Amino acid sequence: RKFLVAEIPENLDQYPHNEIEQAYISTSPTIRIRKSDSDYILTIKGKGAVAREEFELSINEEQYKNLSEKVETRFVSKTRYIIPIDGGLNAELDIYHLYLDGLLTVEVEFPDMAECMSFVPPKWFGKDISDDKRYKNTALSLFGKPE
């Protein structure tokens, strides 16, 4: 599930983080390229808002650069922090940059649908935007920050 952020957690710099840039070669079906620090990944995603199947393939820097010339969206740039939360889960806090500056989202992935639906978010989480298509990374890369 995906949420806006009501308050940035304290001591953010103590958590592991990655610098991510990503763009979409296609939005239907979803085909994404991503650079996360020094890793390069091509992802193909299935349909669905909360539960989606993904196929990931590691690619090299040269392949990433070649595929970058084929994208149909702008690049999304963000810093992702991995923050442990209750229940042995991790919250992925994304702080967006460039044309999305000021946008913060947090996402939690669950082992099953029952745990997903019974999840009680920590106080620092804001509004649940899991079903709001404007906050999908594909929409952000096409249309920018929602009003």
Predicted regions and their residues:
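Phosphate-end processing signature that detects enzymes handling 5′-triphosphorylated RNA
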Residues: 2-147
